[in-house]
Amino acid sequence: MEVNFVTNRIEIAPTTRHEGHAKLILEVDEEGIVNKAYYLNTTPVRGFETMLKGKPAEFAPIAVMRICGICQTTHGIASCEAIENAIDCEVPDDGLLLRELVGIGNRLHSHPLHHLLTIDDFLKPDETDLKIELIKLIQRMRKVGQLVVDIVGGEGIHPPNIVIGGMRTNITERAKSRLYYALRQYEKDAYELYEKYTELIERYLEEIGIPDLGAHEYPYIATHTTYGDRYAINWDDVTEIPAQRYYDDEEAKQTTTIQIPLYAGVPAEGGPRARMVKFGNFREGGSAMDINIARAQENLGAVYRALEILDELDLNGKTRAEVEYKDGFGIGVHEAPRATNTHMAEVGKDGKIKSYRIIAASTWNFPIVEKAIEGYPQQYAEVIMRAYDICASCATHVIVKDEETKEIIEVRKML
C-alpha cells in the first residue's frame, strides 16, 4: 500500500484475492474515511471483439471462452445465444436444459471459489481448525461444480459441447445418476457452508460496528435466476462509455482498461444480491457483505434447479437445431456467477461475424465497487471490493480511438 500524506491519497496495488489484476486509489479525509474511490482494472486488453470480426460464427463461442478460465461457460452460452438470436435459430428444449445445467455447474464451482478467497476476511487468526474445515468443505463443492461442467460440457475448462444451435450431445443415464448423487452431496455441503459462512459475516459486522458497511443507493440489474433473459432489459437504457469520459481523475483515465456500462444513465449492481432481490425475498440496500450471504444462498438455489433439470431432461431428446445463416443482429444474455453477461453479434448470410460486442459481468460492478467504498473507513476498502467477486480479465475492453487525434471517441448505445 502506497500513501501520499500530502494529498491523502492511498493506492492499493494490486488488490488481492480476486481474478485478474486491478488496483484501488482512495482519497481519504483526516479520519481515514474515503471521500472518493477509483477501482481500476490493470489487466491488459486482449481485443476479443476486434478479433472476431470476419471470423466464422462457430469460432465465436470457442474464442470467447478463452476470455477467462473461470467464466468460460457463461461466455460460451451468451455467445451462442447472441448468434442464435441473430439468425432466428430456436434451440430444442433439452438443449436449453443442458445449457442451463452446464451454466449452473460453472456457478456451483465459481461461488465456492469466492468463499475460499474471502474467508480470511472474517476468520480470526486462532481459528485454524475452522478454516481447515471450511476449506475442505469448499473444495468438495468446487469438485462437484467442475464435475457438472466436465460431464455436460464435455470438458471442465473450455466445454466444447456448447455450440450454436444448442448442445453437441445429450448425457447418458449413467452420467445422470452420477450427477444426481454428486449434487445431493453438494446440497448438504452448501447448506452447512451457508450457515457457518453467514455466522462469520454477521460476527464480523457486529465486531467492527458498521452494520451497513459498503451500502450504496444504486439500482440492481438481473434478468433470470439461473439462465438469462434478453427481454428483461430495456436496451435503450443501456450505454457503455469510455473510462476517459467517466472519470475526472487523470490517473484513472490513463490506467483502467475497461469501459463503463450504465443503466438509465447510472451504474447498476449485478450478481447474486441483484438476482436475489429481483427474483427472491432478499433484503435490499444493506451492507456489501450481504452479497457474500446472497452468494452462499445462491448455491442452494442453483443446486435445487440442477436437480430439477435432471428430472425434466429427456435423455433421448434432441439437443441441437439445424443452423442456417442469414443477415441479422442478436443479443445473448446469461447470468454469470458475478453479474449479467451480455454478448451482441451481427452476422452475415455467409456465416461470418460482422461486428461483436461484449458487456462482461464484472464490468457492471467496477463502478459500483467505487460507490460502495465511498463513505467508509479506508481499511475496509478491499473487504468491500472482494464482496463483488470481481473478475478483471472478463472486464477488460477494447479502446476506440480517432486514428488522427488518438482521442477516445466512442460512447456506445447497445441498439
Swiss-Prot record:
Positions bound to Ni(2+): C68, C71, C391, C394
Self-association state and partner proteins as the record states: Heterocomplex of the form (alpha(1)beta(1)gamma(1))(8).
EC number: 1.12.98.1
SUPFAM superfamilies, per database record: HydB/Nqo4-like
Cofactor(s) required for function per UniProt: Ni(2+); iron-sulfur cluster; FAD
Coiled-coil features, chain-numbered ranges: none
Role this protein plays: Reduces the physiological low-potential two-electron acceptor coenzyme F420, and the artificial one-electron acceptor methylviologen.
Single GO term (MF): flavin adenine dinucleotide binding
Gene that produces this protein: frhA
Keyword Repeat on entry: no
Superkingdom per UniProt: Archaea
Keywords: FAD, Flavoprotein, Metal-binding, Nickel, Oxidoreductase
UniProt xrefs under NCBIfam families: frhA (TIGR03295)
Family of this protein: Belongs to the [NiFe]/[NiFeSe] hydrogenase large subunit family.
Cofactor note: There are 12-13 Fe atoms/(alpha(1)beta(1)gamma(1)) unit of the FRH.
Identification of the protein by name: Coenzyme F420 hydrogenase subunit alpha
Catalytic activity: oxidized coenzyme F420-(gamma-L-Glu)(n) + H2 + H(+) = reduced coenzyme F420-(gamma-L-Glu)(n)
